Amino acid sequence: MIQAIVTDIEGTTTDIRFVQQVLFPYARERLTPFLREHQQDEEVANALLSLRREVEQPDADIETLITTLHSFMDEDRKSTALKAIQGIIWRSGYLQGDFRGHLYPDVTPQLADWQQQGLKLYVYSSGSVDAQKLLFGYSDAGDLQPLFSGYFDTHVGAKREVSAYQNIAHQLAIAPQALLFLSDIRQELDAAQLAGWQTCQLIRDLPDSESRHLQVSRFDEIDIEGFTA
């Protein structure tokens, strides 16, 4: 019996185009001047320290780090430091009303229904926990943060690594077979399944012919009772 649902964001709750055409360009355009101005701010300084450790360049100056971050964005690297800095920049965008977090219309009602049924809801995304909270806190459906019991990012591991799902299950103290992971990416679901989780693939466009996971096109097509250990 499912006790908790963990959902991905990009391509699952949220149109991938919002991330790629709104969020990513917004951060890219502002990254250089933002870091030059705010490099001494505590949360920015901590992210830059993490970046120096990640690239094993403890003495790298700000211009070197800026170049590195732009390279990471070009590569779409799932860098924890990059995600933290993007999240800090996006915060100002949400607060200023430059954009609101996109959610597919089927998402909010179903999340609310699951919560009312007593299911715990969590988010696991490559984006930083702060960025996740911003997207759901300033979504086009309002502030949805009260629906969620917690958030996970790459601090628990990469989304295609089995150990990440083992870590989440351990932190939640819930048996893996009682956890359901929702994602649009087959390889992420493969990793969750190998960790003993239940899985469901959200297909917002064309079906994934290579996937062995249950596929649905909307959140309200997910039958929680259909998942058994």
Curated annotation (Swiss-Prot):
Swiss-Prot/TrEMBL keywords: Amino-acid biosynthesis, Hydrolase, Magnesium, Metal-binding, Methionine biosynthesis
Pfam families reported in the protein's UniProt record: Hydrolase
Pathway: Amino-acid biosynthesis; L-methionine biosynthesis via salvage pathway; L-methionine from S-methyl-5-thio-alpha-D-ribose 1-phosphate: step 3/6; Amino-acid biosynthesis; L-methionine biosynthesis via salvage pathway; L-methionine from S-methyl-5-thio-alpha-D-ribose 1-phosphate: step 4/6
Substrates-to-products reaction catalysed: 5-methylsulfanyl-2,3-dioxopentyl phosphate + H2O = 1,2-dihydroxy-5-(methylsulfanyl)pent-1-en-3-one + phosphate
MF term (GO), any: magnesium ion binding
Cofactor: Mg(2+)
UniProt EC number: 3.1.3.77
Cofactor stoichiometry and binding remark: Binds 1 Mg(2+) ion per subunit.
Keyword set includes Transmembrane helix: no
InterPro entries attached to this UniProt entry: Enolase-ppase_E1, HAD-like_sf, HAD-SF_hydro_IA, HAD_sf
Source taxon at top rank: Bacteria
EC top class named in words: hydrolase
Key word Hydrolase present: yes
GO biological process: L-methionine salvage from methylthioadenosine
Family assignment from sequence similarity: Belongs to the HAD-like hydrolase superfamily. MasA/MtnC family.
Chain's role: Bifunctional enzyme that catalyzes the enolization of 2,3-diketo-5-methylthiopentyl-1-phosphate (DK-MTP-1-P) into the intermediate 2-hydroxy-3-keto-5-methylthiopentenyl-1-phosphate (HK-MTPenyl-1-P), which is then dephosphorylated to form the acireductone 1,2-dihydroxy-3-keto-5-methylthiopentene (DHK-MTPene).
Subunit: Monomer.
Name of protein: Enolase-phosphatase E1
Organism encoding this protein: Yersinia enterocolitica serotype O:8 / biotype 1B (strain NCTC 13174 / 8081)
